[in-house]
């Protein structure tokens, strides 16, 4: 059925596009075509998530339609509500892998440490994710070749791609979460990492003040979805920004994350406060938010996405940009940010990304294994 839909769509649209471009007319999809494309994309997203999530609601909108490189390029935005299918965190593949690895630990001290970490993660997952609707926004692109002759129809290949946040485009197979086997392996690997490399960074009295769940809720409230006003050049008056803080418009990412951290309990000082460089600068080239948080012993750096629970900072290593993780259920992750504005935005690859995780987990009331 999917193949038949693609062939018919490619044929119909190709004839229309060729005619429109020859006449130098703007090409528009009619209502029925838009409806079919949206329905197709929605089904592909639901199928990609079917192993782990039910999808109570999904809304896909066509953002733009262009002819480029002999293809019809359709950019789409999706808002997805997803709920984990499992009834307990114990049923998640990542947790299963952790518990299996813990059962093999013979040293009592190591066993107790690993077990304590697993119990706290399970508590977090059961309360914040199991049975809870998670909102997610994602960008997609459909590429339909323009076919000049009907004889070439069966050689055509229409692509639906996920537009990742580090400027990658991924196939729907790559967009889909990892297999259960891979997630179990990652759970085992993480327990080994805790046992072999665990250390704590306790250099400040402030880590215990940071409530990462409050920070999570703050960034969700004061960021816009991947919609009308998600870009840096839109009307600032339409953006969802907290009026209690200054708005740096086209360079507001660090200012936004600083707000969340402060609202979540970390006190300001002479160096890190609104208006100072450490507050509104990322630290990509030194002397910024990231530098301050690490030097003060509040956050530590890791490239392990499983450590980056909600309330962690996400940083782009090749750009001066930061955001905050707002969801990590061990299957998928989302983040919120300003400039460009993102709200519970999906991402898959972590190439070019690093995470800064609170050294104190306010939710489980324990120091975070590094």
What would you call each of these model-derived segments?
Residues 108-214:
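Non-catalytic propeptide/linker segments at domain boundaries
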Residues 192-278:
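N-terminal capping segments
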Residues 70-82:
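A short hydrophobic beta-strand element
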Residues 334, 348-370:
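Low-complexity, Gly/Ser/Thr/Pro-rich intrinsically disordered linker/tail segments
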């Amino acid at each position: 059925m999917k193949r038949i839909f693609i062939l018919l769509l490619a044929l119909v649209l190709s004839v229309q596009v060729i005619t429109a471009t020859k006449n130098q007319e703007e090409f528009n999809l009619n209502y029925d075509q838009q409806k079919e494309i949206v329905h197709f994309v929605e089904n592909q997203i639901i199928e990609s998530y079917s192993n782990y999530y039910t999808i109570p609601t999904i809304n896909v909108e066509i953002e733009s339609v262009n002819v480029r490189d002999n293809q019809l390029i359709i950019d789409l935005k999706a808002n997805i509500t997803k709920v984990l299918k499992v009834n307990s965190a114990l049923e998640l593949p990542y947790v299963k892998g952790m518990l299996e690895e813990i059962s093999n630990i013979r040293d009592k001290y190591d066993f107790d440490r690993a077990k304590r970490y697993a119990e706290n993660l399970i508590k977090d997952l059961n309360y914040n994710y199991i049975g809870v609707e998670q909102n997610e926004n994602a960008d997609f692109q459909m590429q339909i070749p323009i076919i000049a002759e009907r004889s070439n129809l069966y050689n055509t290949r229409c692509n639906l791609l996920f537009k990742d946040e580090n400027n990658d485009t991924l196939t729907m197979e790559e967009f889909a979460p990892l297999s259960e086997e891979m997630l179990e392996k990652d759970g085992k690997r993480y327990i080994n990492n805790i046992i072999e490399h665990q250390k704590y960074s306790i250099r400040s009295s402030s880590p215990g003040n940071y409530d990462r769940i409050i920070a999570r809720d703050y960034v969700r409230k004061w960021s816009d979805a991947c919609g009308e006003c998600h870009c840096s050049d839109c009307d600032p008056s339409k953006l969802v920004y907290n009026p209690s803080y200054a708005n740096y418009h086209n360079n507001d990412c660090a200012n936004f994350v600083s707000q969340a951290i402060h609202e979540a309990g970390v006190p300001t000082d002479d160096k890190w406060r609104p208006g100072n460089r450490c507050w509104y600068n990322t630290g990509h080239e030194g002397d910024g938010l990231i530098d301050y948080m690490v030097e003060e012993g509040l956050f530590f750096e890791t490239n392990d996405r499983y450590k980056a629970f909600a309330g962690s900072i996400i940083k782009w290593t090749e750009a001066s940009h930061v955001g905050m993780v707002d969801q990590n259920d061990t299957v998928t992750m989302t983040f919120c940010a300003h400039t460009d504005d993102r709200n519970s935005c999906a991402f898959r690859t972590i190439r070019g990304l690093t995470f800064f995780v609170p050294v104190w987990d306010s939710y489980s009331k324990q120091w975070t294994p590094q």
